């Protein structure tokens, strides 16, 4: 039986990776903090390894690891420089130093980055055709971490593969899916400018498939692959399926200029009242008011990647999870 070690195993992406690899008959080890909420891992045969990447030298790594998938990360376009440097870049440096000192003989190290390192606001974005640069700290330190890992691959022959998923959604997603569904239930889903812009969605099982293929495909060390659903879906289309499932109607469409005004006012308030939680910034407005998709032909060709495009099935899986979480009292 092959063994995979997944960092951030209790999170949205990490827990879905655990499920996927268990179904593929892998022995799954998951890194979690002692203070972590382990609800998403309940009932799964995951061997928990307790530790913190900021104290990576204390992590007891199994010696018989075949694959490591590093997805633990700060994940927010609102996160500040200090948090991103610590929890994206430095955490990875610490982890890799510990792996090298532990002399882990792994077959592949998979780093979960983001498609935003290639930019946004353009169609068919790729390394050869980059989009508008995303300049906030989250992306800055994802790029810096990718570069560090590539340097380490060259100097220490780390069998590295980088995955760059677009905007990930699916069951166990409390960050985006839950607020959207709550908004719809409460009767105020807001769509800007008619929701006509294409958005680069990536269902979490498609990300998991990409991670699995990145583990087993030979001769791809040092390469990076972008992951999406390979479908052009607009915000309006994305919302419409959830609206239909919840028997709701879209009531509010707001003009494009208004979110920019709101984002500016939130920035001003946050400047004078740092404790104020900003829910909107100029980047988020630009994302939902410009077309973005990515060219994944390289991923399809080299990994034999076949993304699931059954959005009805995907949305039903999200709905089933969401309603079960509400019934169990995990969501207020």
Segment roles from a protein language model:
Residues 122-168, 189-192:
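Catalytic helix-loop patch of NAD(P)-dependent Rossmann-fold dehydrogenases
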Residues 144, 173-179, 193-215, 222-223:
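Substrate-positioning beta->alpha
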Residues 204, 240, 264-306:
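Conserved C-terminal active-site "lid" loop/helix of NAD(P)H-dependent oxidoreductases
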Residues 4-24:
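N-terminal Rossmann NAD(P)H-binding glycine-rich loop of SDR-like oxidoreductase domains
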Residues 294-302, 306-332:
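Amphipathic terminal alpha-helices
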Residues 37-42, 46-91:
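NAD(P)H-binding glycine-rich loop region in Rossmannoid oxidoreductase-like domains
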Residues 94-137:
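Conserved Rossmann-fold NAD(P)-dependent oxidoreductase catalytic core, especially the SDR/UDP-sugar
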Residues 213, 217-279, 316-319, 325-332:
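Mid/C-terminal beta-alpha module of Rossmann-like enzyme folds, strongest
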